[in-house]
Amino acid sequence: MPVINLEIKSRMPYAGGQSFGEVGAYEQVDGMVHFGVDPDSLANETISDIRLAPKDGQGKVGFSSDFRVLVPVDQSKGNRRLFLDILNRGKYSAAKDMNSSATFVPDAPPDPGNGFLMRQGYSVAWCGWQHDVPEISGIMGIRVPDAATTQGPISGKVVVTFQFNTPTASQLLSDRNHRSYPADDLDDPNAIMTVQEHEDAPEEIIPRDQWSFARVEEETVVPDSQYAYLASGFQPGKVYQVIYTTTGAPVSGLGLLAIRDFGSFLRYGSTDEGNPCAGNIDHSYVSGVS
């Protein structure tokens, strides 16, 4: 089985031991699930660059994901169904809507809301699958290896586009504080920044000496490979683009295997393998919202 170890870090009463109708109380299980997958399996062949990922002594590609599972304390009262909620940027999505729960709060247990899923007896699970989510406690992600060739790590060009609503001096080279691809060389003369008046307007190249890889911190410009800084400031409405070289190619498609294989493990894995749902799932439902 692709799940090689379920590392449980905590078990606690869910929602302070709240009882959900005839099903009763739930338990919350948190931890890390470790995978080892065969890169040559037909079931995995559509994952881009999986054969370029490093392998262990058994020829498997390893990676790991954060997970959380909610199960009835008395699983005989459950409905023998699993609801696997696909995280959106590491945050709960579908289950929140199903339960009419409060807005996601990092590092806080999922709000039970009206308890719909629990009152129906569902086991509910989440598994990190995006490698670039912010490293914030409570946001679930996945740790994947970088692809590499016989010549070593993979380098290539990255294009980052951004547009602002307010004047800004520096910008992280990613969206919504996700992990960025850092520039290889802060002084790379071949790095390019362009600006457009709007999306369909012609691009104008901004002279290299007018911008840099840096961030503004307490009114001081600090060199930083993960930020772009423009001396004159980024203007609202205009479209900016940075093209630069980076090294490191995470095999991000492994996140899709994490969802597939964690869901399968919860349905078919045994008690001896550490499965908190062992023997209590007949049907699985997978849903996500973006």
Regions found by a protein language model. Name each.
Residues M1-V289:
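C-terminal His-loop and adjacent cap/lid subdomain of alpha/beta-hydrolase
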